[in-house]
Amino acid sequence: MHPQRKQRLMIVLFIVVFSSLAVGLIAYALRENINLFYPPSKIAAGDVPHNTRIRAGGCVKPGSVVRSQENLDVRFVITDGNADVVVSYTGILPDLFAEGEAAVINGIVTEAGDIQASEVLAKHDETYMPPEVAEAMKGKGQHQATCGGLNYGA
């Protein structure tokens, strides 16, 4: 093989190997940080993989927030109007977190079908609803500017 041709082949091989390695590392990093969004009805139906980090959203069901007296543990229920999911969280909730308002939860679905939250995000103003929550509720004929007016069921 001609030396110049051999040198070109080595350069091309180096570029291919380096590019493949870079793509592999990027894919691995993104896989660790991707949180798929699921509405409460999909979680309650069991359509969500357990022990996988997800993002869930809905309205905090009125009367469902229970705070521990001993520590920062909080339990509450989120709903999309069709199904309810219990959320457990340890930490300080955002100032705008309230019953009957939209919330987005980052966490892990337990074997029991509950969510162990690592982060709770609350709405920003009286007309804001997270896009994922609005999309999940749109097909139900219950989309509201906020969670007010949502039929929470009995």
From Swiss-Prot:
It is found in: Cell inner membrane. GO terms for cellular component: plasma membrane. Residues 30-154 are periplasmic. InterPro entries: CcmE, CcmE-like_sf, NA-bd_OB-fold. Keywords: Cell inner membrane, Cell membrane, Cytochrome c-type biogenesis, Heme, Iron, Membrane, Metal-binding, Signal-anchor, Transmembrane, Transmembrane helix. GO terms for molecular function: heme binding; metal ion binding. The keyword Transmembrane applies. Residues 1-8 are cytoplasmic. GO terms for biological process: cytochrome complex assembly. It holds the Pfam family CcmE. The chain crosses the membrane at residues 9-29. It is a single-pass type II membrane protein. Its main location: membrane. Heme binds at residues 124, 128. Heme chaperone required for the biogenesis of c-type cytochromes. Transiently binds heme delivered by CcmC and transfers the heme to apo-cytochromes in a process facilitated by CcmF and CcmH. Belongs to the CcmE/CycJ family. PANTHER family: CYTOCHROME C-TYPE BIOGENESIS PROTEIN CCME HOMOLOG, MITOCHONDRIAL (PTHR34128:SF2). This is Cytochrome c-type biogenesis protein CcmE. It comes from Cellvibrio japonicus (strain Ueda107) (Pseudomonas fluorescens subsp. cellulosa). The gene is ccmE.
